[in-house]
Design a protein with these regions (language model features):
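Asp/Glu-rich intrinsically disordered low-complexity tracts
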Residues: 4-5, 12-13
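PAPS-dependent sulfotransferase catalytic domain
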Residues: 11, 57-109, 115-219, 271, ...
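A short, charged/proline- and glycine-enriched loop
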Residues: 17-23, 102-103
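N-terminal pre-catalytic "stem/leader" segment of glycosyltransferase-like enzymes
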Residues: 22-66
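General alpha-helical segment detector with a strong preference for membrane-spanning helices
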Residues: 34-36, 116, 253
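The conserved 3'-phosphoadenosine-5'-phosphosulfate
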Residues: 54-62, 179-243, 247, 262, ...
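Anionic, Ser/Thr-rich low-complexity intrinsically disordered regions
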Residues: 233, 238, 243, 252, ...
């Protein structure tokens, strides 16, 4: 760690905790989750941790719930347990626990559902003919029943109440108060921290406390953010119509925003403010040290390249600087880098175990489900 990036944090006693090395992050769609993911990928790479990854791309499941059989054999560590899960999936609690370290922290992030939906509508091209074939304003004008009748797009991955869907729930449960309450209870038990995108710095202070990490570990550049010119302005009436359609996500968001506020209130205010201000200052330091200019992500090369021109990327001053290059890396490029490194690491260990006559180093995968 850099020597000037501040003490670790645990409540108001900054020297008493031990850094944690395992975390499950349920990466929700269009909720600033790529920003958090970059933090976790940096930490995992720096400490040679093992990631849950698919054979290609940045998904391990979805729209079907996560299953351990989705992980290719060559990714598995010998222990059969992973340190970091930071890529898109659809939550299945029991299956996830089977592959994660027993001491893993559980974290996710939510966003104002109207803002999330507006972003997803544009980013995933809901408006094109092979999807919903209408503009966002035309969609807003539809009766609620017509909105609800539209199918999910992208092979079932994307649609309304996306956060509830990513968390493993059928949005139709919103009509059953008992099931809604059970959902909230189950998620409260499963997750140590539910971050809120509109409170990113505050959420990261709590993540830092949870993981006992340094300020540099949780500093960030915003990832996958669209240009302001692409956003659709919404009136109060537009928002009200979308809130009705996104009812289950609204319930989730309000519940966990309140829970986050309670977690913030549990930290001494002077400690919390000091760590928030330190995080902001550290981010500004790296912006000045690393970034030459912002650009369309699709115009950038190598591991900084984004797959769409809708989002911002960063031209760097010095691409050889480890911290700068990682802060600026696009999700796909960074994921490929981690996958290649883990493939090589697992191959070396299997070769070593094979020399020692230890079953060729075969990974110990969880037993098949009955």
């Amino acid at each position: 760690m850099a020597g000037d990036d501040g003490p670790k944090m645990a409540g108001d006693d900054s020297d008493s905790c031990v850094p944690r090395d395992s975390i499950f992050f349920l990466k929700t769609h269009k909720c600033a989750s790529s920003t958090v993911q970059n933090i976790l990928m940096r930490y995992g790479e720096k400490h040679s941790l093992n990631f849950v990854l698919g054979s290609t791309g940045n998904y391990v499941g979805s729209p079907t719930p996560f299953n351990s059989r989705l992980i290719p054999d060559w990714i598995w560590p010998r222990s059969g347990k992973f340190d970091v899960f930071a890529h898109h999936t659809r939550l299945h609690v029991a299956e996830t626990r089977r592959v994660m370290q027993d001491h893993a922290a559980w974290v996710t992030i939510l966003r104002d559902p109207v803002a999330q939906f507006e972003s997803a509508f544009d980013y995933y091209h809901f408006s094109i003919a092979q999807h919903w074939n209408m503009t966002l304003r035309q969609f807003i004008a539809l009766p609620l029943e017509r909105k609800q009748a539209l199918g999910r797009i992208g092979y079932g991955r994307f649609g309304g109440n996306q956060m509830a869907f990513d968390l493993g729930y059928d949005p139709a449960i919103v009509s059953e108060p008992r099931l809604v309450q059970a959902m909230l209870d189950d998620l409260d038990k499963a997750f140590d921290l539910v971050m809120i995108a509109e409170m990113m710095d505050e959420s990261l202070v709590l993540l830092r406390q949870l993981m006992c990490w340094s300020i540099d570990d949780v500093t960030y550049f915003t990832k996958n953010a669209r240009f302001d010119s692409l956003r659709t302005p919404l009136s109060g009436a537009d928002r009200a119509a979308l809130e009705k359609f996104l009812e289950l996500d609204m319930i989730l968001y309000r519940h966990f925003r309140q829970r986050l506020a309670q977690q913030i209130a549990a930290v001494p205010i002077a400690t919390f403010l000091a760590h928030t201000e330190a995080l902001v200052a550290r981010r500004l330091h790296y912006r000045q040290h690393c970034v030459a200019s912002e650009a369309k992500g699709s115009e950038l090369q190598g591991q900084q390249h984004e797959i769409t021109d809708k989002v911002k990327g960063y031209r760097l001053i010095d691409y050889s600087d480890w911290m700068c290059s990682r802060l600026g890396m696009a999700e796909i490029g960074y994921t490929d880098l981690l996958r290649d490194g883990q493939r090589q690491r697992m191959a070396i260990w299997r070769w070593v175990y094979g020399l020692l006559g230890m079953d060729g180093g075969a990974p110990q995968q969880p037993e098949e489900r009955t």
